[in-house]
């Protein structure tokens, strides 16, 4: 279906705001891999994407390395398609990113592999899903554990009671990320 057709089904959907969210989640995800801090993005990603990201971070960590994605930015993102499934909506997004891609040794900071002088362009196909019976995003800004206000853009964990905020119950979650 087209974006206009989807807006008729979900009048709260805004293409520009959605793509801004996609770009931010993508940058946060690669930054979380680089910093070996996947908890900071756990609430934005599915279990499969978490496992993919964790495998990259774990391999680097186990070897005493760090995967670097320096000077990371999104050059372009666009909605390829929108599908309605029985229990969820699916939006496929094409994303063009640029970054320095290299690996460093954590003990001395030396470069192990890659290029820290020239950015590469990498294209991705991303899939975002949202449950049809989701609650409104405004309601989701309260911790499910204690009711305290939470900032879902910075962390998926309540700073008061440590409850984990599950974004898929309320909003779009990245469920697939593949190089195009």
Q: Can you name each region flagged by the protein language model?
A:
Residues 1-71, 159-160:
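Core segments of small alpha/beta cavity-forming domains
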Residues 98-134, 170-180:
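Intrinsically disordered, low-complexity segments
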């Amino acid at each position: 279906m087209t974006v206009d057709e989807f807006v008729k089904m979900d009048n709260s959907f805004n293409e520009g705001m959605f793509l801004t969210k996609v770009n931010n989640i993508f940058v946060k995800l690669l930054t979380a891999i680089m910093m070996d801090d996947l908890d900071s993005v756990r609430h934005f990603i599915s279990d499969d994407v978490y496992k993919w990201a964790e495998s990259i971070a774990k391999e680097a960590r186990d070897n005493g390395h760090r995967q670097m994605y320096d000077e990371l930015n999104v050059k372009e993102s666009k909605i390829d398609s929108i599908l309605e499934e029985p229990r969820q909506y699916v939006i496929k997004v094409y994303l063009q990113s640029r970054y320095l891609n290299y690996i460093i040794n954590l003990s001395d900071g030396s470069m192990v592999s890659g290029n820290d002088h020239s950015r590469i362009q990498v294209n991705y196909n991303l899939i975002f899903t949202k449950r049809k019976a989701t609650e409104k995003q405004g309601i989701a800004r309260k911790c499910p554990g204690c009711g305290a206000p939470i900032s879902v853009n910075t962390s998926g964990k309540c700073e008061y009671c440590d409850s984990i905020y599950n974004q898929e119950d309320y909003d779009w979650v990245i469920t697939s990320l593949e190089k195009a």
